[in-house]
Amino acid sequence: MAHFTLDTFTFNKDVRKVSFGEYNIRPPLIKPSKLTYVENGGVGKELSDGWALNFAIGCIHACPFCYVDNIHKRFTFARVGDVVQRPWGMYFLKPRNIDEAIKKTPWKRWKGKLVMMSSTHDPYLPQLYPTSRKILEKALPAGVKFLIQTRSVLVTKDLDLLSEYKDQVILQVSIATLEEKFASIIEPRAPPPKARLEVLRKAKEVGLKVGVIVAPIFPPNKVREDVKEDLEMIMKELADIGVDQVFGEMLHERGMNMEYIESLLWEKVKIDKELDEELGKMFTELLNKYHLRGKWWYEKH
């Protein structure tokens, strides 16, 4: 196990050390995505009809488990330079030409198609609002459907707009744990999980379809020892809210994320096929117990 200090990755709520910048984004804003059904040529995650809308590079939440940092370090470097070599959560670029890109995107081309917003960053980061609303104001009247994936509470600012097009919208949040100390380590700049549950309640009150990705589920560790107890607490809350769909998956190794995580937890984290099967069984049993509709996403080992 590599030994890093917290200062190495600066996973804290202070964003003053983040490298902020701009880049040019190429329209159309909607691009192909593998986060869809296998029948659509995807990886078996039912999050879109094979389309995603991303409009930033980086994410301020700084979750150490995130797979996106590995993508940027491998593929985005040639386009934006050394900034993506900084630790995850310490670089963030937004498009300087976003208004032009919104205007040049032929939204009606995706009429009736489910688009994920967003797959490589949170679309409701403070640095991106009200850009997210500008996009929706153009896309929703054109008939585009959206699965909005967020950890932010800022989405509640747009419930008026989203409820107007409720047949075209699924509002979905990510929750990895309800244990507050553990959440503060693995989701250092995201709003607390209980605040995200409140987002779902407010969305249901205005008639929106809502979902949750319970992920990533970590194996037992010194900070959060009892996985089943944590999962059961989550499922109880989701059943009480009346969540429409629930997906789950365990922690996966991507790029340097395991080194980040182990340095923050100060212990080795073991993940393997046996753990995936054990957690998948536990998750499915809890879905059935609380009469929730959903699915466990198994890793392809």
Curated annotation (Swiss-Prot):
SUPFAM superfamilies: Radical SAM enzymes. Residues 45-286 form the Radical SAM core domain. Keywords: 4Fe-4S, Iron, Iron-sulfur, Metal-binding, S-adenosyl-L-methionine. One of its GO terms (molecular function) is catalytic activity. It comes from the Viruses. InterPro entries: Elp3/MiaA/NifB-like_rSAM, MJ0683-like, rSAM. This is Uncharacterized protein ORF301. It comes from Acidianus two-tailed virus (ATV).
